Amino acid sequence: MTYNPRIGGFTHVKQASFDVHVKRGEAQPRTSFAQQIKRIFSKIGETLGQLFRHRAPDSAPGRVRLQGVRYVGSYRPTGDAKQAIRHFVDEAVKQVAHTRTPEIRQDAEFGRQVYEATLCAIFSEAKDRFCMDPATRAGNVRPAFIEALGDAARATGLPGADKQGVFTPSGAGTNPLYTEIRLRADTLMGAELAARPEYRELQPYARQQAIDLVANALPAERSNTLVEFRQTVQTLEATYRRAAQDASRDEKGATNAADGA
């Protein structure tokens, strides 16, 4: 698979484009992890491109009428925007699972790449979520969290490198299946619903669905590693957030004491 910017994803290439190329009995060097991630997006993009090009006009969902509290098309009407949006997200998850689950199970190389990309996405999202939160500024908590997060990522066997003593995966970024789910959901629900704040509120749910999709498609060992890594990351976040809160209280207490002196 190769990345096609015109469709924002993948197009098919011959099997020889994967990491190991056989020529006269000799294995060639592995491609970079970043290139592997691009191939995953390329594979996904090809399917999305076909979806957008070949969808019949009468198969598209009807226009959403928010004022009439009725969502028409092939979906059950509802007056709750969040419920309707979640329905479209769930439908997108089903469609992506139908396409990708067999590929992950049958294509070992693609399955490995999706597995590693999902681990990297969990790492990257946790790092951004923690470090961009003003509540974690106090003390020296952020560097300590990143170091602990890197150690957890290293323990999964992800490829990466130490940068100033902190392990960083080579392919940190967005879960490619989450991207596919979101693009499909956008297409199903239409621009009016996709612009609503309820859709943004449901993105953590969509991300979790993407992780669950991958975990359910993987062999047991990798599935367990994926689930355990996510649980470890959640524990680390909770632990270091408490540390940041304690540090913030200590700083405020010291400031108040100095003012009263």
Swiss-Prot record:
It is found in: Secreted. Keywords: GTPase activation, Guanine-nucleotide releasing factor, Secreted, Virulence. Pfam families: SopE_GEF. Coiled coil: none annotated. Belongs to the GEF (guanine exchange factor) SopE family. Monomer. Interacts with human CDC42. GO terms for cellular component: extracellular region. The keyword Secreted applies. Activator for both CDC42 and RAC1 by directly interacting with these Rho GTPases and acting as a guanine nucleotide exchange factor (GEF). This activation results in actin cytoskeleton rearrangements and stimulates membrane ruffling, thus promoting bacterial entry into non-phagocytic cells. This is Guanine nucleotide exchange factor BopE. The lineage of its organism: Bacteria, Pseudomonadati, Pseudomonadota, Betaproteobacteria, Burkholderiales. It comes from the Bacteria. GO terms for biological process: actin cytoskeleton organization. The keyword Secreted applies. GO terms for molecular function: GTPase activator activity; guanyl-nucleotide exchange factor activity.
